[in-house]
């Protein structure tokens, strides 16, 4: 399976380098801004987003927060040349960001991180599918349980109607 990854950076040189790095193994979509990335996410089923943190109109974390509604299963990696420790800690602790890497990055480390992120994507996707299947099966089990309960109620009423009366007065009346 060839995964589709999106790279977002407002520095054209970084976009070109990252695209060349990943194009042999993945389908790569690039965007020079957060706004363009959001528009492209409506058109592409992206498994992984790699974004620069410091961009002009929208930070990488702001972009990632906005992508949750569009692509909730997408895994996100943040690249940063500057350390805004508070924002990074918040993004990591909330589960918004899978990993963050500093610029300049090591190509081998980045490839390894991307590979692991895509493994994580598969696990999360499977978890989501299994959760939906579990929900469907629970609903079906509830339906079956309701039908069984109704059937038992009918059997109980049928037994009551078929049982001989327990009061001797009834026999006297019936003769």
Question: What does each model-identified segment do?
Answer:
Residues 30-39, 60:
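Helix N-cap/capping motif at the beta->alpha junctions
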Residues 3, 12-30:
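Two-component/phosphorelay signaling modules centered on CheY-like receiver
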Residues 15, 56-57, 80:
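The feature encodes the CheY-like receiver
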Residues 129-175:
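C-terminal output/effector regions of signal-responsive regulators
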Residues 6, 44-50:
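Active-site beta3 strand of CheY-like receiver
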Residues 9, 52, 80:
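Active-site residues of response regulator receiver
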Residues 83-86, 105-114, 118, 122:
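C-terminal output helix
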Residues 62, 83-100:
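Alpha4 helix (beta4-alpha4-beta5 surface) of REC/receiver domains from two-component response regulators
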